[in-house]
Swiss-Prot record:
The modification N6-succinyllysine is found at K7, K11, K16, K40. The modification N6-acetyllysine is found at K16. This is Hemoglobin subunit alpha. It comes from Marmota marmota marmota. GO terms for biological process: hydrogen peroxide catabolic process. O2 binds at H58. The keyword Phosphoprotein applies. The modification Phosphoserine is found at S3, S35, S49, S102, S124, S131, S138. Heme b binds at H87.
Length: 141
């Protein structure tokens, strides 16, 4: 459960990310594909080379979804309902992949904002991403 301090940290972090969200999303995807090659199986139609338009486009989708979640942190199930349906019923993404992408996103944010990535902010973002992952996998049952 996200505390009021966590929610404040998440919203502040997302404001700091600002216009870099798409680039950070793409970078996190690239990190995931390099670090966890089995995740590539969900993207057989993508050009997975560094900086490809498809990775950039999907990175923007990831960033936009997370920005929406941060803006609606008090009602994640409603904010992410359509994405949960998509990933559970159409794409059938293994739920472990959300954790892998979350880890890669945390690494990306820490690399770009080391001064702001305090232990408290790290913990808040980790809890937020875990909450997002939980909602995205809620319709798998």
């Amino acid at each position: 459960v996200l505390s009021p301090a966590d929610k404040t940290n998440v919203k502040a972090a997302w404001e700091k990310i600002g216009g870099h969200g798409a680039a950070y999303g793409a970078e996190a995807l690239e990190r995931m594909f390099l670090s966890f090659p089995t995740t590539k199986t969900y993207f057989p139609h993508f050009d997975l080379s560094h900086g490809s338009a498809q990775i950039q486009g999907h990175g923007k989708k990831v960033a936009d979804a997370l920005a929406n979640a941060a803006a609606h942190v008090d009602d994640l199930p409603s904010a992410l309902s359509a994405l949960s349906d998509l990933h559970a019923h159409k794409l059938r993404v293994d739920p472990v992949n959300f954790k892998l992408l979350s880890h890669c996103l945390l690494v990306t944010l820490a690399a770009h904002h080391p001064a702001e990535f305090t232990p408290a902010v790290h913990a808040s973002l980790d809890k937020f991403l875990a909450s997002v992952s939980t909602v995205l996998t809620s319709k798998y049952r």
